[in-house]
Regions:
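Conserved SAM-binding loop
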Residues: 1-84
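S-adenosyl-L-methionine-dependent methyltransferase catalytic module, highlighting the catalytic core
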Residues: 57-61, 65-67, 71, 75-193
Length: 193
């Protein structure tokens, strides 16, 4: 089933929860509509964020929580106003607008967010017109993007560790049991005559 999570008391939500704030998983909560529930890492198959991301203050934290809550292979389905649309900034509650490059930190530069084991991959991306029909970029009012939670590869984790401030080996790199230490050359003999 679906669980409608929102931060606004006036929204018709199942659970009032601010995913831009620190959260500890598993999270036990009591919903007025579904009763006691537990939210935990790797639990969700799909998260839908329809016209949400442009409103949140701490988008990296919200995206981190979405990544944590999704199963590997789970989808984050996003619909946001397109930055270049004439209507993008008409809502005074928007704190950002999105474009094609808005997803790079979550897909390609994931280590900037402290992610190492999982990241997002763009599964699909397209544009919608003001009536929410598929449209070419020139007539776009919205973007619709589906991000897929994927495991990072060993190469990606090595790159991520290299790009991070503290360099560490990923957990799946074998630790050498013997260290190679070259022999020190013997001291040169000096001949005294």
């Amino acid at each position: 089933g679906w669980l409608n999570v929102d931060v606004l008391p006036r929204a018709e939500h199942d659970l009032m929860l601010d995913l831009t704030q620190p959260q500890a998983w598993p999270l036990q909560a009591n919903s007025p509509t579904v009763g006691p529930l537990v939210l935990d890492e790797g639990q969700a198959e799909v998260i839908v964020a329809n016209n949400v991301l442009q409103h949140v203050g701490d988008l990296p934290r919200l995206m981190t929580h979405a990544l944590q809550l999704l199963k590997t292979g789970g989808r984050l389905v996003i619909e946001v106003p397109y930055e270049h649309a004439a209507t993008a900034w008409q809502d005074p509650t928007h704190v950002r607008e999105m474009n094609e490059n808005s997803w790079l930190y979550y897909t390609d530069w994931f280590w900037c967010l402290g992610w190492y084991e999982h990241r997002f991959a763009v599964e699909s991306a397209g544009y919608l017109d003001i009536e929410l029909r598929e449209a070419p970029r020139e007539r776009a009012a919205f973007m619709k993007v589906t991000l897929l939670k994927v495991e990072t590869t060993l190469r990606e984790r090595m790159t991520a560790r290299t790009m991070s401030a503290g360099i560490e080996l990923p957990e799946d790199v074998p630790v050498p049991t013997r260290l190679y230490r070259p022999r020190q050359p013997a001291p040169a003999l000096s001949v005294v005559s």
